[in-house]
């Protein structure tokens, strides 16, 4: 077993993968630079991941991601590199920031986040530091925290999941467990949900969720925010049910509150008493060691009235040489 982290940066222990990260060589940096030049030449109108090295498709760049935040380029490095490699990466990024492709894209700020260090410090290589930044995805607006926290506030790999929820939500009561900053809730309200109940222990994250709803001019009387430990709050959750759609998107590991392999079955076990007669569940996992079969088998054991329907695709900007190690977003239907 080795210490690593899931595709969003949460610490987990997994079996050693066969293709170990390679040194970040000059050739690897040239590959990254060329990729970013091409991406900036056709910069998207909305927030997107521009480079997903963590999918292990580019040797030497396995621990690096680059996100386009509509004028802000956020580069995240998840594992230590040598001082020489870090300096070379910084210089390459500075060169990129003074290129014609950079100017033509409308970019103005460039951040390098060192996710492997305590508190994930961020270096502002270009542009004036800003604490909050508003972005757009699929026509919806979200507020991000830049340079202050490990995660900025929206997991871009779940883009298709949010779109799916928006398409499914009309007229439904929705339960959003492990809600974080309520991205699913925003999508559900935009899709015409009757009510959304968000639960997360992190009240600061839920507060940002309120901000996200306000950015989209949503009626907050349709949204409930529960800042509680789920395993001590089943009664509060049930009070607002039954639910037509339940979303479960937990961290792989949260010290003192959630261990996916141990606690996920406890959540699944409660679904039959929370779900409406023909309700739907979107069950998600980012832990590399746990493939989709784990969730399918766990659901069959803990909530046999729910049947696997489909696995949502991951966005194409998140290629992965081992798809079962990437994000799993599985749909289950009650019959």
Language-model-detected regions and their locations in the chain:
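C-terminal catalytic and target-recognition region of SAM-dependent MTase-like enzymes
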Residues: 280-335
């Amino acid at each position: 077993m080795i210490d690593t982290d899931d595709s969003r940066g949460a610490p987990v222990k997994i079996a050693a993968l066969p293709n170990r990260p390679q040194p970040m060589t000059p050739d690897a940096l040239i590959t990254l630079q060329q990729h970013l030049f091409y991406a900036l030449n056709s910069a998207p109108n909305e927030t997107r991941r521009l480079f997903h090295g963590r999918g292990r498709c580019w040797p030497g760049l396995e621990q690096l991601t680059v996100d386009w935040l509509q004028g802000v380029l956020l580069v995240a490095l998840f594992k230590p590199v040598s001082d020489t490699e870090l300096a070379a990466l910084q210089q390459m990024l500075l060169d990129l920031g003074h290129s014609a492709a950079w100017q033509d894209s409308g970019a103005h700020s460039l951040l390098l986040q060192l996710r492997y260090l305590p508190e994930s410090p961020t270096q502002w290589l270009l542009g004036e530091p800003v604490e909050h930044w508003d972005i757009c995805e699929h026509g919806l607006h979200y507020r991000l925290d830049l340079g202050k926290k490990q995660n900025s506030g929206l997991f871009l790999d779940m883009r298709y999941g949010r779109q799916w929820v928006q398409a499914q939500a009309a007229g439904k009561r929705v339960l959003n467990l492990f809600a974080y900053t309520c991205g699913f809730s925003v999508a559900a309200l935009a899709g015409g949900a009757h009510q959304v109940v968000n639960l997360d222990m992190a009240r600061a994250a839920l507060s940002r969720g309120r901000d996200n709803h306000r950015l989209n001019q949503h009626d907050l009387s349709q949204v409930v925010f529960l800042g509680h430990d789920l395993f001590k709050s089943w009664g509060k959750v049930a009070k607002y049910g039954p639910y037509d759609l339940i979303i479960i998107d937990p961290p792989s590991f949260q010290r003192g509150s959630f261990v996916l392999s141990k606690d996920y079955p406890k959540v699944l076990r409660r679904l039959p008493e929370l779900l409406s007669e023909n309700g739907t569940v979107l069950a998600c996992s980012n832990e590399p060691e746990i493939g989709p079969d784990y969730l399918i088998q766990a659901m069959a054991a803990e909530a046999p009235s729910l049947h696997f329907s489909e696995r949502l695709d991951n966005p194409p900007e998140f290629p992965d040489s081992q798809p079962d190690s990437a994000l799993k977003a599985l749909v289950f239907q009650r019959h």
